[in-house]
Regions:
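Residues forming the flavin
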Residues: 1-285
């Protein structure tokens, strides 16, 4: 069995920052993707750091990445045990178990899917989470069909409203609360582009088969659409360690600790987790 000082789960901004802060320790960083960077790699919009886009900001984080860090990419961590062992499944090596002294969970967050919402009707083609569509448009060159309806007006919903409207599609946003939920800089698209925002309403039914044709709101308005994007919020992804309690060797950082609106806070938490883990290892010695 392989032995590491620190196992980091997640290769986004928090995981990268943690690995850099733990420089000098024997570190393994595991991530599901083909390269580190996390969700930053699919964020074509600017607003990261000094007005960079996501890939540019990720490249800056990785510029001085420690050469000694082991990277287990295209790898899923299946389980973590209280005896400080983890089971990994990777495309390159299949199953393997590793031991660690300190564990940093930097797995980010996941979107709330349609299935978790009280929406009746069929489940046709043409329904995506906002993050799925962001990845498809920015990394795969996909262009959705319009009209587009977006459920939720948080930052990710607004970012995708702007991007789909700039692609020439008709866009309607439906927000359950009485006002828009995103940051002011992201709300600017509502005045700069022909995006309709409906507040104080929600979607209660989806229509169409095999492809979506429209949806009905709680207030009874029918909205025709070829694409429905779910931007209903984000949840920290920490189920992997939910049964461990909070032992001193476990450090949870970034968006799997709490969802942060700004990447700088994610990097700060990752750095703090890496430094704390490194101090704990040195204390054991």
């Amino acid at each position: 069995m392989e032995h590491y000082d620190i196992l980091i789960i997640g290769g986004g901004a928090a995981g990268i920052a943690a690995a850099k802060a733990a420089r000098g320790a024997k570190v393994l960083l595991a991530d599901r993707k083909t390269k580190p960077g996390g969700v930053l790699l699919q964020c074509a919009h600017r607003g990261f750091g000094k007005d960079q886009n996501g890939p540019e900001y990720a490249a800056g984080l990785l510029a001085d990445f420690p050469e000694g860090v082991g990277l287990a990419l295209e790898t899923t961590v299946l389980s973590v045990s209280k005896d400080k062992t983890a089971v990994l499944s990777g495309k390159a090596f299949g199953l393997r178990a590793v031991c660690f002294k300190q564990l940093i969970l930097a797995a980010g967050c996941r979107e709330i899917p349609l299935g978790a919402l009280p929406i009746a009707g069929t489940r046709p083609k043409g329904i995506y989470t906002a993050g799925q569509m962001q990845e498809m448009m920015n990394l795969q060159g996909f262009t959705p069909e319009g009209p587009v309806v977006i459920l939720g007006s948080g930052d990710l919903g607004l970012i995708m409203a702007k991007q789909t409207a700039e692609a020439g599609l008709s866009v309607t946003m439906v927000e359950q609360k009485t006002q828009c939920g995103g940051m002011a800089k992201n709300q600017r698209c509502l005045t700069e582009l022909p995006i309709r925002l409906i507040c104080g309403d929600t979607i209660t039914q989806v229509h169409g088969h095999p492809h979506i044709e429209g949806c009905t709101t709680k207030n009874g308005e029918y909205l025709p659409c070829e694409t429905l994007l779910i931007a209903a919020g984000l949840r920290p992804e920490r189920e992997l360690v939910s049964e461990l309690g909070r032992p001193g060797w476990l450090h949870i950082c970034g968006n799997c600790n709490t969802v942060h609106p700004m990447v700088e806070a994610v990097v700060k938490e990752g750095t703090r987790a890496g430094l704390t883990a490194l101090e704990n290892i040195r204390g054991d010695l």
